[in-house]
Amino acid sequence: MIWSRKDEAGVLATSLKSQWIDAIDASPASNLIAFSSGKTLSVIDATDMGFRRDFQNERTVSGVGFDPKGRRIAASTYGGCALWYARIEQQKPTMLKWAGSHTGVAFSPDGNFVVTTMQDAQLHGWRLKDSKDMRMGGYPSKVRAVGFLSGGQLLATSGAQGAVLWPFIGSNGPMGREATEIGYDEGSLVALVATQPKHGVLAAGLSDGRVWWADPAGQGLNFVKAERGPAIAALALSPNGLRVAWADEEGNAGVVEA
């Protein structure tokens, strides 16, 4: 795993026993970088080359995600999610349990919820103050990407013919509420979504190679890449939410204004 700062050479960080690195996340708030290899969750500090923590999980780690302050890390595994404090060397994780294979993980921007993607085409979540379970299903395919927007009031996901939006308003999050869907197209699937938590917009990359940008509070979609082709394999939104970067499965890529 290589990380770099502007005008500086890249820095190499390796996994224990030279294992394949599976997942990665970084926290601008704490300058920490977390990555997983097998059952090991590793943490390094971008400002302190001597700092490193290696935490052992009971199962293989499939996804990692920092909380908003960069102090805790969620690690998705088979059977649920483990919560670790990023800097404490000797500790036991807090376990959030739910049967099944959890493939990715994210904190809500207010730090009150943790959401995982699952192998069996659904999401699961927990309200952290009481570990209350939240089930979010109904997807026709596996959810590969999630992202919060509108100050954390909405969670956008891939995995359907349109981008699925779950409400995260109030202390109950999506519990007892229905999801909505934008950009529905029967002939394609949303492969990826990209968001910026502070802004109320999102981008979606489709299985047929198209990319659109939208404001859910407005009307219509802006197809920033309208031509069809290989499925979109990577997608990102600029910090101001107004530029979209994409790449497809054949190595084509672009950056476009929304």
For the regions a protein language model found, what residue spans apply to each?
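WD40-repeat beta-propeller superdomains and closely related acidic/aromatic-rich repeat-like regions
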Residues: M1-A258
